[in-house]
Amino acid sequence: MSKRTEQLGHEIQRILGEILQYELKDPRVGFATVVGVEVTADLQIARVRISVMGTPEERKETMAALERAKGFLRRRLAEELNYLRFVPELRLILDTSVDYSLHIDELLRRAAAERAGSPPPQPEDDKPAE
């Protein structure tokens, strides 16, 4: 990735993050975060990795709502990136790396507890309410 495409990717990530947080008012969009943006060398396509918290159904609904809002997102990008002749096409990709890292962390915690001879700790969500 060239320095220019990398800088543009960071700028798109910052702008889209602000738009998702402050401007997008769709109630179907849950807690979504722009994790990263890769821009192709010809600046025609921006692959936007988005992490969404929630159940699989909520994630699917959020991604569908974001797909429907792509026109708005691209228009707002064009306003912010007015120095570009052409704003890249947005390709939204659900990023599950956070979920995967949490899963690996839980497996490591259980393995460490088994080595120590104590029962594995229960995840925060599984503890009974007091």
Curated annotation (Swiss-Prot):
Belongs to the RbfA family. Its main location: cytoplasm. One of its GO terms (cellular component) is cytosol. It comes from Roseiflexus castenholzii (strain DSM 13941 / HLO8). HAMAP family: RbfA. This is Ribosome-binding factor A. The gene is rbfA. Gene3D superfamilies: 3.30.300.20. PANTHER family: RIBOSOME-BINDING FACTOR A, CHLOROPLASTIC-RELATED. Monomer. Binds 30S ribosomal subunits, but not 50S ribosomal subunits or 70S ribosomes. It is found in: Cytoplasm. GO terms for molecular function: ribosomal small subunit binding. One of several proteins that assist in the late maturation steps of the functional core of the 30S ribosomal subunit. Associates with free 30S ribosomal subunits (but not with 30S subunits that are part of 70S ribosomes or polysomes). Required for efficient processing of 16S rRNA. May interact with the 5'-terminal helix region of 16S rRNA. Keywords: Cytoplasm, Ribosome biogenesis. The keyword Cytoplasm applies. One of its GO terms (biological process) is maturation of SSU-rRNA.
